[in-house]
């Protein structure tokens, strides 16, 4: 049976017994006399026990009794200590003594004692001092809620133990410092031994790893070096951790209890304010709204408790007045209820009113919390629906946009493809028509040449017949002449010799004529074939071509003066060049630690020695180099040289420059130069490519800047092998 049920049962029994009691005057007088005969200590004990049950504050749940003593003892402190009401309170305490001996109520008192609210129970053992101390503690509160220390279960003994732990921790820390000061040799010996062994292991491992890495391929070594650097860092961290653990027993553990207790106390003091210091992020907005509403509900409950306390004070004053009137009436000889019956009646009324108020407060609180939760759920559901609608709308818009972009892209690509196809088809048709015309002309010329070649034997035969027809007539005329003429004739042998010589001359002449006609035909045919793209050369032409090629090669392969040649007096202004790209390949290392890297300076681009790898590389696809020429000239062209694809290990030259610009400067200190031209290097073309300036009138310059805008796709660096500048001297 609960406490409320027992009290109601007791009150009903008292009411039934009160009908047969004696007169109120005698009972009141007797009871008052009995009470005033008690000792002061007994009176205070009964008052403390009665104040514990006077007016419990309204609370939710089973913890409502833990805050009872504040309201009861504050009322007693303000109104009832030393008043006639103490007599009535003593009687009610006698009626409720059997309730305090029950296990349920004693368990509740133990819980209150742990929270710092069981002052009345401790007063039974300590007397007046404990009771006054409990009254002072509860009267100092302002809201009916216990402090954070009371809720956490802190007592004076706990504070004393934490202070002793702090003092012991400080003493152990001082002893550790004193040990370090008085005995430093041991500490430094351990530290030196640990550093020496660690360094020996580190250098040995680095040497072995260096040998292992250098015997592997380049890519494998790079990946392995990265992994080993990471492993070395991990080893260093492990060594530091081991060192900290090694020195841990020497005194670091003395600081742990003090730090832990201080941190726990700090966290317990800061715990109620955590929700106020959090950032109002989107993720915790709902939780913060619930917390704020719960706190507002707590403030309302505090206000309601204050109102209930004030009403209870008013009811107590009115009850006191009623008792005084009743006592006066009893002394006057009138017949009325006894004092005990009146007290039982009033206490039953107060308990019923208290139960009603608690039930109403519980219902109102539950209804209010349910309304708040329903509102929060509705808001959360509405926010979720709005967010889902927005997401769906955004996804639909993005899908529509993507579909529109796809259709636009398809239409644009189809139109562009059709336009390019039509243009390409027209160009091919025009080229085909021109080729047909040229082929027809070539066929006609070939037929005419064939006809001329076919007529050559007939011409030779006609010439021979003409000679044979003319020779007998000459002989006949010579033989029929006079003797004087015959005396000048040669002998037969001489005549045969003359005839043989004449025949040789005729054959030589005919051969020359045939060769001349053949050369003319071959020359005309070669010109025609050269126009059509078919090259047919003779041995003489081959010799001439080879001779010209060798001469061009001896003339620096382009046959133009290079005013940017370093051996001719040109130089690179290194302070106005891009940063050189480091290859990260160490030529000199110690225990795997690189000490010196090899890298080419910008001077390489002014030197004629060109072979793979002997170039100047700068970081990224963009860079520049400023060159002072050997003389002031009027620039006409520039030449850019790169290694061919056939000499590249990967058969690609993605590090070659693509788009570049040439600027001219009047002096070294000039910040911005004059743009002379913008060109593009073709990676599929010749290794040496010359670019001519289009300006008709060019000023004279002695400082030229080569500015690389893009390369052919290498993301890390760009290479320049040789740069030349051509022009006319200013004088």
Curated annotation (Swiss-Prot):
Signal peptide: none
Annotated positions of the Phosphoserine modification: 12, 39, 55, 120, 123, 147
Record keywords, A-Z: Coiled coil, Disulfide bond, Endosome, Glycoprotein, Meiosis, Membrane, Nucleus, Phosphoprotein, Signal-anchor, Transmembrane, Transmembrane helix
Coiled-coil regions listed: 396-452, 486-519
Species name: Mus musculus
Side of membrane Nuclear, spans: 1-226
Region (Disordered): 1-69, 106-142
Region annotated LMNA-binding, chain positions: 1-128
Bilayer disposition of the protein: Single-pass type II membrane protein
UniProt note: domains: The proximal coiled coil domain mediates trimerization required for binding to nesprins. The distal coiled coil domain is proposed to dynamically regulate the oligomeric state by locking the SUN domain in an inactive confirmation. The coiled coil domains are proposed to be involved in load-bearing and force transmission from the cytoskeleton. The SUN domain may play a role in nuclear anchoring and/or migration.
Residues in SUN domain copies: 569-730
Subcellular location per the Swiss-Prot or TrEMBL entry: Nucleus inner membrane; Nucleus envelope; Endosome membrane
Name of the featured protein: SUN domain-containing protein 2
Gene for this chain: Sun2
Pfam families named among the record's database cross-references: HTH_SUN2, Sad1_UNC
